[in-house]
Amino acid sequence: MNVQRPGLAVGPLFENPESESSEPGSPAAAARWVEASTEAEASAASSSQGQIVAAPTAEERPWEGRPQEAVSRTRAWREAGDVDEPLDLSFLSLTPLSIPLVSGLRRLNVNNNQLGDLPDTLPGTLLELEASENRLTRLPDLPAGLQRLNVENNRLTNLPEPLPAALEWLGAGYNQLTRLPEMIPPELIWLGARNNQLTSVPESLLTQLGQWSSIDLENNPLPHGVQTNLVTAMHAAGYAGPQIFLPMGPVELARRPLHEVVADWLEGDLETVAAWRGFANEQGARDYAHFLDRLRTTVNYGNDAFRQAVAIGLRQAVARPQLRAQYFEQASGASDSCEDRITLTWNGMQTALLIADVEDGVYDGSLHQLLQHGRVMFRLEALDGIARETVNSLRRTDPDADIDEIEVYLAYQTQLRDTLELRHVAPDMRFLNVSHVTEEDVARAASSVRELEARGFGEYVATRWQPWERVMRRIAPASHAAMQEQLIEAMGEEFRSRLDEKLAEHGLTGDADAERVFGAEILNDIARRIKGETMEKVLRGRGLEL
């Protein structure tokens, strides 16, 4: 038995085709469409109570799926009055998109329907269009201001040309694309085209986009020659184009002798290059050579100051075996991962060089510079803690999200390099756009580090930054010796007295676990006081204070 559901009375909405307010995209038309649809809902309810009639034919109903839910969502969106909120018509099994799209609409989500096409005319105000998981075989002309387009998992064989000049994100994976547009929007940060039928790419692909952009071409039938040409171009010195993910996967650079790789960074410095030839058999030398080769392919290679910093590090490591050993150790395994891991590892090597300079007495005669380097170390430690919490928070929020902690850590370092005067780290990174670190995150981190520094930098230098104690032993041996004597003396009677008092205060006398916990707290407090007083005395004697 079939119960009739009257078709929605959409016809009268467009009785006067000459009227501007009757255009499918106009607010008036959309309003009357919603009104008519609402009347149809009421009519359907009354009809079902009083009569049983034949079901409508396919011609009598303008769409399949759940049109009434689409009506309700559209009405709710209009009533909310916030044009920045997306109109969400996803998961409704709609076949055509018959709802008139109101002018002024900025964000539209029609994911997971059964759409075979989209309206020929989309609102000119549209900024974001989500239309994945449908049956689209073509796309209409796209609004010039469109910034984000997601049409993954459809049946597209090509993309419209030209693409909007403002487009920043394009997801077109899992379609049947046989070619990419010749002209790529210059602002595009992400082009996802994996799992298509691409056999070639535009010749100018690598020159149309900059180093911040990424293109995913995995799982396409690209000939080996095409892929090899792309890889060769991306690994050329000075390459400043996009990062491209290819079907062949990561490409292993041929391993070169250490001195040959070093020579690329030290042009004309034959003496230093010859010295590096003698380190080829040291443990970790081969990994370090490969690391230096990969470092030439990073986004920072085009920066003159960066290249000079690498060269300085190489010259310093010639005469400092311990520093060289740290370089070799840190390079182990670093080249097996993405480009940004290479950059983050180099940042660590720069930190090792800075600490080596301090410990070797380079700043013994310039305590002001020494303390500034101490602030840099404090800020880096604070940023590490913030990055770690960001990673944990992102994973708690979405356990299935692909969070790469390397990108998170490096994002904070590069984005706060100037603000926090972290001048020794690399200035750029490749994949900032997938780090999940927002401008708001960066601003909060800067404020947090400044607050932590204001409260805790003095204690950090006095008790936790080992280079300071080594410097003090050299420049103020008497003060350092007196400090050691004070510490030894305080760890006797003062420590025992304070511990007994605290145990009694908490009713835990004789409790071994409490002794360990309270004992550690008291020892730290004693060290803070004595080391802090000594540090302040040494600095005051040289006209400095924190």
UniProtKB/Swiss-Prot annotation:
Top-level EC class = transferase
Q: Which Gene Ontology BP terms does the record give? A: protein ubiquitination
Ranges for the region named E3 ubiquitin-protein ligase catalytic domain are: 257-546
Task: Identify one Pfam family in the record.
Answer: NEL
UniProt-listed SUPFAM superfamilies: L domain-like
Q: Which residues form the NEL domain?
A: 257-546
Q: What does the sequence similarity comment in the record state about its family?
A: Belongs to the LRR-containing bacterial E3 ligase family.
InterPro entries with a match to the protein in the record: LRR-bact_E3_ubiq_ligases, LRR_dom_sf, NEL_dom
Q: How is it modified after translation?
A: Ubiquitinated in the presence of host E1 ubiquitin-activating enzyme, E2 ubiquitin-conjugating enzyme and ubiquitin.
**Which residues does the entry assign to the active site, renumbered to this chain?**
338 (glycyl thioester intermediate)
Give start-end positions of Low complexity composition bias.
22-48
Q: Give yes or no: UniProt keyword S-adenosyl-L-methionine.
A: no
Matches recorded under Gene3D superfamilies: 1.20.58.90, Ribonuclease Inhibitor, Shigella T3SS effector IpaH defines, Shigella T3SS effector IpaH domain
Q: Where is this region: Interaction with target proteins?
A: 1-248
Origin: domain of life? Bacteria
Which parts are the LRR repeats?
Answer: 104-125, 126-144, 145-166, 167-186, 187-208
Q: What is this protein called?
A: Probable E3 ubiquitin-protein ligase NGR_a03640
- Location of the region described as Linker in the Swiss-Prot/TrEMBL record: 249-256
